[in-house]
């Protein structure tokens, strides 16, 4: 037979590791939600600043914004 059976006594539980012990407190907050809006406004500001950054990079790439002293091929 190709399948192998394992007796209940031979099965081992999950191994404990140092990294797992360090990360366990982070997982204990799973499922908990802060009341209200939380950090949503901060995320909105970060997204807006990132959009401005991307638009500036795009304008430089398209040579819409000319920079003094920098030659573009």
Curated annotation (Swiss-Prot):
**What is the protein name stated in its UniProt record?**
Photosystem II reaction center protein H
Region Disordered: start and end of each range?
A: 1-21
Sequence similarity: Belongs to the PsbH family.
Where does the protein principally reside?
Answer: plastid
- Superkingdom of this entry's organism? Eukaryota
Gene name of the encoded protein = psbH
Q: Which UniProt keywords apply?
A: Chloroplast, Membrane, Phosphoprotein, Photosynthesis, Photosystem II, Plastid, Thylakoid, Transmembrane, Transmembrane helix
| Protein's organism | Lactuca sativa (Garden lettuce)
Transmembrane feature ranges? 41-61
Subunit note:
PSII is composed of 1 copy each of membrane proteins PsbA, PsbB, PsbC, PsbD, PsbE, PsbF, PsbH, PsbI, PsbJ, PsbK, PsbL, PsbM, PsbT, PsbX, PsbY, PsbZ, Psb30/Ycf12, at least 3 peripheral proteins of the oxygen-evolving complex and a large number of cofactors. It forms dimeric complexes.
């Amino acid at each position: 037979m190709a399948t192998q059976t394992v007796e209940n006594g031979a099965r081992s539980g999950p191994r404990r590791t140092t990294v797992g012990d360090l990360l366990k407190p982070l997982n204990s907050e799973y499922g908990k939600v802060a009341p209200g809006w939380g950090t949503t406004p901060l995320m909105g500001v970060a997204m807006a600043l990132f959009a401005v950054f991307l638009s500036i990079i795009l304008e430089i790439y398209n040579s819409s914004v000319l920079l003094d002293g920098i030659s573009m091929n």
